[in-house]
Amino acid sequence: MEMTKLFSYIVIKNVYYPQVSFGISANTFLLLFHIFTFAYTHRLKPIDMTISHLPLIHILLLFTQAILVSSDLFESWNIQNNDLKCKIITFLNRVMRGVSICTTCLLSVLQAITISPSTSFLEKFKHISANHTLGFILFSWVLNMFITNNLLLFIVPTPNRIGASLLFVTEHCYVLPMSYTHRSLFFILMVLRDVIFIGLMVLSSGYG
């Protein structure tokens, strides 16, 4: 058992950590680039806001994922209450995943609108303002927080004795058994979100 844990740790350290480090570094560079560009030009287009928002989401997504995967990072995070720690990190990670899907969809749609010809029905959307884009981004945050809020009730730190009914999340966090209603509602909301936004993404990419 100890050898298995050691092997798993080595695999994670040698494979996952470099990918996370590169991803966070690349997205930080993109975020800073767009911030400096806006500071220089003082003009913020709807597509610029979306492009700036996406690397921020990816940074948070990778960071929370790294904490969940790494025992060292999880234990070093300065919160003594493991229950609160599990809930916050898992909740943020799932919200970031959903917001990433929504923001990527928005970016794809905005790009399709930008390159659409004047005869296209998308022409009337070319004058969309940055306020509309900001409104959609805020909506995507609220939507995904609503979809994911059940995790705040069911995520718990690893108990001393792990029952067969608990669902493994990480070495430190497990999911309590859900009722059929909770489980079905959570699944339906996630599937609907993914189908709608990924579907719009595919349609707009095909249009472009």
Curated annotation (Swiss-Prot):
Q: Identify the Gene3D superfamilies for this entry.
A: Rhodopsin 7-helix transmembrane proteins (1.20.1070.10)
- What Pfam family is a match, any one? V1R
State the Gene Ontology terms under molecular function: pheromone receptor activity
Q: Does the keyword Cell membrane apply?
A: yes
InterPro entries linked to this entry: GPCR_Rhodpsn_7TM, Vmron_rcpt_1
> In what tissue types does this protein appear?
Expressed in olfactory nerve.
Disulphide bridges, residue numbers: 86-173
Task: Give the way it sits in the membrane.
Answer: Multi-pass membrane protein
Question: Know the name of this protein?
Answer: Putative vomeronasal receptor-like protein 4
Q: Which organism is it from?
A: Homo sapiens (Human)
**What are the leading ranks of the lineage?**
Eukaryota, Metazoa, Chordata, Craniata, Vertebrata
